[in-house]
Amino acid sequence: MVQKKFCPRLLDYLVIVGARHPSSDSVAQTPELLRRYPLEDHPEFPLPPDVVFFCQPEGCLSVRQRRMSLRDDTSFVFTLTDKDTGVTRYGICVNFYRSFQKRMPKEKVEGGAGPRGKEGAHTSGASEEAATGSSESGSTLQPPSADSTPDINQSPWGKRRAKAGSRSRNSTLTSLCVLSHYPFFSTFRECLYTLKRLVDCCSERLLGKKLGIPRGVQRDTMWRIFTGSLLVEEKSSALLQDLREIEAWIYRLLRSPVPVSGQKRVDIEVLPQELQQALTFALPDPSRFTLVDFPLHLPLELLGVDACLQVLTCILLEHKVVLQSRDYNALSMSVMAFVAMIYPLEYMFPVIPLLPTCMASAEQLLLAPTPYIIGVPASFFLYKLDFKMPDDVWLVDLDSNRVIAPTNAEVLPILPEPESLELKKHLKQALASMSLNTQPILNLEKFHEGQEIPLLLGRPSNDLQSTPSTEFNPLIYGNDVDSVDVATRVAMVRFFNSANVLQGFQMHTRTLRLFPRPVVAFQAGSFLASRPRQTPFAEKLARTQAVEYFGEWILNPSNYAFQRIHNNTFDPALIGDKPKWYAHQLQPIHYRVYDGNSQLAEALSVPPERDSDSDPTEDSGSDSQDYDDSSSSYSSLGDFVSEMMKCDINGDTPNVDPLTHAALGDASEVEIDELQPQKEGEEPGPDSENSQENPPLRSSSSTTASSSPSTVVHSAHSEAADSTEMGDKATAGISKPLPPVPPSICKSTVDRRQTETGEGSVCQRTYDNPYFEPQYGFPPEEDEEEQGESYTPRFSQHVSGSRAQKLLRPNSLKLASDSDAESDSRASSPNSTVSNNSTEGFGGIMSFASSLYRNHSTSFSLSNLTLPTKGAREKTTPFPSLKVFGLNTLMEIVTEAGPGSGEGNRRALVDQKSSVIKHSPTVKREPSSPQGRSSNSSENQQFLKEVVHSVLDGQGVGWLNMKKVRRLLESEQLRVFVLSKLNRAVQSEDDARQDVIQDVEISRKVYKGMLDLLKCTVLSLEQSYAHAGLGGMASIFGLLEIAQTHYYSKEPDKRKRSPTENVNTPVGKDPGLAGRGDPKAMAQLRVPQLGPRAPSATGKGPKELDTRSLKEENFVASVELWNKHQEVKKQKALEKQRPEGIKPVFDLGETEEKKSQMSADSGVSLTSASQRTDQDSVIGVSPAVMIRSSSQDSEVSTVSNSSGETLGADSDLSSNAGDGPGGEGSAHLASSRATLSDSEIETNSATSAIFGKAHSLKPKEKPAGSPIRSSEDVSQRVYLYEGLLGRDKGSMWDQLEDAAMETFSLSKERSTLWDQMQFWEDAFLDAVMLEREGMGMDQGPQEMIDRYLSLGEHDRKRLEDDEDRLLATLLHNLISYMLLMKVNKNDIRKKVRRLMGKSHIGLVYSQQVNEVLDQLNSLNGRDLSIRSSGSRHMKKQTFVVHAGTDTNGDIFFMEVCDDCVVLRSNIGTVYERWWYEKLINMTYCPKTKVLCLWRRNGSETQLNKFYTKKCRELYYCVKDSMERAAARQQSIKPGPELGGEFPVQDMKTGEGGLLQVTLEGINLKFMHNQFLKLKKW
C-alpha cells in the first residue's frame, strides 16, 4: 500500500540457477548461479547472492529419469525485501528438470568447465530478506509427525539406484528466474516459459542435424552450453549462433519499457504474432485495487472460510503466523493473499512468503520478537533438527488444512456479529460462484454442508437491505476467477467499514502535524465507546499498529478503491485490478522482443520429437501430476529430508567470481530491428486476455486505445543505472535510434466523470463554465436504486425526482422557516467585499462550531463539502474527489454521540472527512421532519442564549432553568455555544503583539451566574468523559480561560469602575501586571467576546482596504441588512453609554445581545467606525470588523436542504474579534473558512517570539512575564476558578458567601475530573485539532503534503516551525490549566512529556516546554500565564468575484491568505487554492474591472479571468500578500532570472556583440551595428 518508488526497468535481472556439475550420487546439491543477465549490478539494487536459495529452496535436486516428465515443470513466486528501505522485489521462478549424462571415467570433463569453478552471485550490497516460492501443482502433505522424522541410516536411495540398472541418464533441477520491482507474475511466467521453449526447440533441431554427436548428448548440449557446463569454443558455430540469438532475445526483454499507472500499457511481442499474442503489461490507477496477479481466494479454497478467517484474525491482532506446505506456489500465494486481504489496512511487520529450507540460519528469523508472517516448505522443520519452534507461533498447515495454536496462546476473540456472518456469507457466495452453476445459490448454509442446492433464477429474495441497488451480490459481475477475487476484496473492505469494526474511524483521529511527515493520534477510548456493541475483537484491533498507521495513511492515501466501495461501487469494471478491465483505456506502447530475421523461427516451426526417452524439459500446457518437489518416490517426507541432510548442502551466502556468469556475447552486439509502426488510428490486435468479452466500463469519457496515440518502440534506451552491456556500448546493428521511454511516472490523468446506472447507461452533460466541471453531486430519487457511484457535477436540488439545471446561488437556498432573511438574501447585491480582522478568540470559533453540529445524525452540511482543486482533479481519480476541508472535522469532534446512539446513516471509514462525497442515500435521505429537528436545535440555542443573557444581566441562571440547562450542556455543541457567549475577554492589537490576554472584571451577581454555568459545564464534561470523550472535550480550554480571566472585586469602588480601566490598563503602569492584567490569562486560548473591544493603537485599525471577510452563505443579505440597521445599532449603542455607575459592569453585554438579535435575519452584525461618537470615551471600541453575532440559534438561520446545513447556517460563521469566550480549542475556527493557508499565522515579532518572554526561567523563580501581583490585587479579586475548586478560603465570610452562591444541584467541592490524566490528553488532542482547523493547517492534507514536498528547505522549515509553535503553545496552556486546577505536579510532568513525545515537537520548542516543567515545583495557581494561540493573529480578506469578464459569470469568493489565494464557490465551499509560487503573472484593467491571473498548471500556463468591482483593491491586496510571502524567503537563493545578457557573434562578419533578453523583448548590440537586416524567406 505504500507508494513505491518508480523503477525505470520492467525487469531487473534474469538469472539461471542450478548445479554446474550435476551429480547422480546425491539427491541434492548446493544451488549455484549459472548465468545472469545483465552482468553488472544496478546501483540501487545489486543482485542478492541469496537468490539461488529462493529459486531452489530445498537445494538443487537430482532425480532419475522418468517418463512422466511434464509434471515437473513448475513455477512459483518469492519476494526479496530490503531490510533498510523496505523496498520489495518480486522473483518469478520456473523450475524444471533437464537431463544430464552420468559421467564415465573415460569421458572428458566437458570442455574444461572445471576451471570455471563454483558459481554464485555477485557481491551483495543490499540487505535482502525473505522470499516466496511455490509450485503450480498442488500436492497434499500430511502434517509432520513423530514417526516421520528423518532416518539418516535408512533410505530408499540405494534401492532406486540398484533398480536403475544400465540407465545412465539422470535429471537435475534447473531454475529460470526474473527479478523485478513489478508484480506481473503471470506475464513474467509466460516470458520464462517462452525462453525455455526457445532453448528446447534449439535442442530438438539438433536431432535433425548430422553433427557427429550422439543423439542423447545432442539433446543435452544446448542446455549444457546455456548453463555454462560446456565451453562454447568446442562446439559448432550453429550452436553458437542459436545461443547468441537467445541471449539477444533476453537483452531485448530486459530493455522493455515500463507501463505508467492509469496512462500507458506496454504490449510486448515475445514471439511472432502467429505463434503467440503479445503480452500486456498494465498497472491500475489509484482508484482501483492494487494489482494482485495471483488467485487471491486461494487461502479460502485451501483452508475453508472459517479457518481462513481464523488466520486473518491472528494476522490482524499481530500474532506470529507461520504457514507451511510442500507446494511452493500455494505457500507463497497464500501468504501474499492474506496480506492483500486486510486492505485498506497494511501489515506493519515482516512478511516472508517463502523461507528456504537450505539457507543457513534461516530458522533464526522465527525467533524474532516482533509479529511476522512467514511461509516455509514442509521440510523446513524436519531439516532444522536442532530448532525448537517458539511457543507463541500459530502454525498453519496448508496441506492438511489445519490451524495449530501455540501452547501458550490466548484465546482468539470471535469476530463481531452480525458483521462476521455477513462476511462469511459474502465469501461463501464468491467461492460458490466459481462452480459450474452460474446462477446464485439461494441457501449458502446448505451449500456449505454439502446438501442439495436450490438455485434461484433471479436475485436472492432474502436481501439484507431494502434497496436492491445496495445489495451486495458479486455474482452479478461474473463467475470468473478474477471477478471472484474482486468480490473477496470488496467483502473484506465492507467488513472493515462495518459498525462494530472500523466504521467512523477517522472521527476519532486527531492530526497533530503534517510536516515533515504526518503524525496522527488515535483516540481509541472514544472509538470503542462509539461501537454499537462492545467486542473484544474491536478492542484489540484498535490497539494494533495497523490501525494506528491507517490514521496517518488515510490523510494522503496512495489508493482510493476503498472509498469507492464505501460508495457502493462493486463492479470489477470500475475497481478491478486486472488489465482486461481497463487496458483499452490506456495508450498502447508496442515493443517487440522477437527478431523477425532470427533463425529461431525455424526451430520453433520444427515439431518436437518424442520417444520413449523423452526429455523432461519439454513444455506442455499443464502438469499431469501433483508436484512433489522431486520426492514422490520417497515413502515419506522424512526419507526425503534424510537424503537432503546427507548431501551436506552449503547454505551460506555464495561469493564467487562474476566472470563465471559471462554471457556468450556482448549486449552491445544485439541487433534490434525497428518494428513496423501501426497506421494512425489503427486499433492494435487484442491479446488473448483482453479479447474475451468483459463488462463495459461505464464511463462518460473513457479513453480507448483507438482514440489515443499509439506509441511504437522496438526497444528502450537503458538508463544510466543499467549495465554497460545494455547501454554503454554503441550498437552497430541498430537500424534506427530507439525512442527513449520517459523514466518518470506521471500521475493518472484519467478524466472520467461517471454516472453508474443499473443498465450501464451514461449520463453526460456539457459545462461551459470551467469552474463547474463534472465533479460530484447527488443522484435523483429515480436513479437511486440503480446508482452505483455519483458523478453529477453540481450541487443540485431535486424537484420531482429530476435534476435541477440551475446552479445554486446564495439566494437559492431555502431557509428552515419563514423570515425576512430569505427575501433580503434574494435582493442583496453580491458585488460587495468585506474585510476581517480575525483577532477573535476561542469563543467565536466555538459559537461558529456549534452551528455546524445540529442534526449530527442526519445528512452532513454542504459547507463541509469542498471542491477539489483543479490540480487534485487532474492527478487523482475519476470518481468524485470532494475534499472536506476544515469544517467537517469540527463537526465530527463536537457531534454528540454515545453508545447505541443511532445515526441516520452509517459513516464510512473516512466518514465525512473522506475525499469522496457520500453516496446518494447518505446525502439525500434524512429522518423525518428535518424542519422539526432544526427548529428544536434552534430552540435549544435560543433558550441557552436567554439564560446567558440573564446571567450577564446579573439575574443568574434561575432555579427553574437549572435542570434543563444541565441536560442541554451534555452536548459539546451547546457547551461551545454557551462558553462563546460567556467569555467577555477583550484583546486589543497591542495586547496581541505583546501576547497578552487581559483579565475581565465582572459584578458579583454576574460572577454567581457564570459560576453556576461553569459548574454545569463541568458536570456535562464529566458525563462526556464517562462516555470516553464522545463528541469532543475541547470546550474545557474555553471554560478554564473564562475561569482564569474573569473575576469580581470585593471593593465597592472597584465595582463602579468602567471596564476600560481594567481592560485597557497599559502594561507596565500597574507593577503587578507584566504582559497581562493577570499572569494566567496569557496562556489561555482566547475566546471571542460579546463585549466591546479595546481600541487599537491607531484608533482606526486596518480599515485602509474596504474589504470585509465573507463568513457565510447568507453574507450577501447581511451586508444589505447592515446598512438597513446601522442607525438602529447606533442609537442603541448610545443608550448604553448613559452613566450608570452602580450598574454591573457587563450590563453592556445586553447591547451586544440586542444587536445580535436584531441582526438575526442577516446573520451578520457589524460595528462600524462610522458609528463611533463619544462612545469611545466610555468603552473601547474595535475597528470596523464583523462581530460574531449570537443569532446562530435563530430559527431563520437554519438552512433546510437535502444536504443539511450550509456554510451560512448561522450568523456565528462570521468572524470578529470579541464575541465569546476565548479558549484554545475554538479560536482557530473563528473565520469559518474551509481552506485557509497552512501558514496563515501572523509573522510579526510578537507571534514568532511567542515563547520569548514567558520562559526566561531561573531556578526557584517565577517565569518572566508572570510575576506575582501585589497582595492588594490578589486579595481583593475572586476568580471563577476558585469557585470551581470549592471552598478553600480561610475566612468564614468567604465560606458563607460561597455557600449562598451554590445551588442545590451543583457540587460545592472540587471535581474529580481534574485528576483524570486521560481527560487532559483527550482535551489537548481535541484542542489541537480545532486550532489547526482555524489556522488552515488541516484543510486538504493531500494537497498540503504535496506542496510541502515541492518547497525549498527554508519554506519547509517555516511550516515545521509553525506546527511546533502551535503544539508548544497548547502544551504551555495545558500546564497552566492543570496548575490552576491543582493537578498533581508529577502527573503533569508525565502527561506533558508523553504528549510532547507523541507530537514530535522540535528541539527549540520542546526545550521551552521542558523549562516550564523544570520550574513546576515553584509554580502554583495562576503563576503561569496562558498564551494566545496563533489563530488570534490571522488576517485575511475576501472579495466577491465573477468568473469571466462580466457579471454574467458565476459568483465566487476569493480569499487572499498569507501564502495562497483561495477560491470559494457561491455556497462557501473551497473550489481552488493557488499557491503564490504557482502564480506567474497578474494584471488588472480598471476600465473593465477584470483581474487576470496566470498560473502554472503542471507544464502548462493557465489564464483565469475574474470580474469584480473591487478590482484594484483585490489586485493590490494579492500583491501585498505576495510581497510579504516573498519577504519570508529572503534567505533563499534567488532562482534564475528571466532574461539576461548573452555573448553572441555575427556568423557573417565575425563581429561580437551582446544579446539582451528582457521582459520587454530582445535587443542585439554590436560594436558597430545596432540593427540587423532581416531578409524575407
Curated annotation (Swiss-Prot):
Domain spans labelled uDENN: 13-267
Expression (tissue specificity): Expressed in the brain.
Lineage: Eukaryota, Metazoa, Chordata, Craniata, Vertebrata
Amino acid composition bias (Basic and acidic residues), ranges on this chain: 106-121, 1127-1141
GO BP field: anterograde synaptic vesicle transport; execution phase of apoptosis; negative regulation of apoptotic signaling pathway; regulation of cell cycle
Record InterPro entries: cDENN_dom (IPR001194), dDENN_dom (IPR005112), Death_MADD (IPR056574), DENN_C (IPR043153), MADD (IPR039980), Tripartite_DENN (IPR037516), uDENN_dom (IPR005113)
Protein name: MAP kinase-activating death domain protein
Region (Disordered): 106-166, 604-635, 676-840, 912-940, 1050-1109, 1127-1272
Compositional bias of kind Polar residues: 141-156, 688-698, 793-803, 1157-1172, 1232-1248
Acidic residues compositional bias, start-end: 614-629
Domain of life, source organism: Eukaryota
Phosphothreonine modification, residue list: T1060, T1065, T1235
Compositional bias annotation for Low complexity: 123-140, 699-715, 826-839, 928-938, 1189-1203
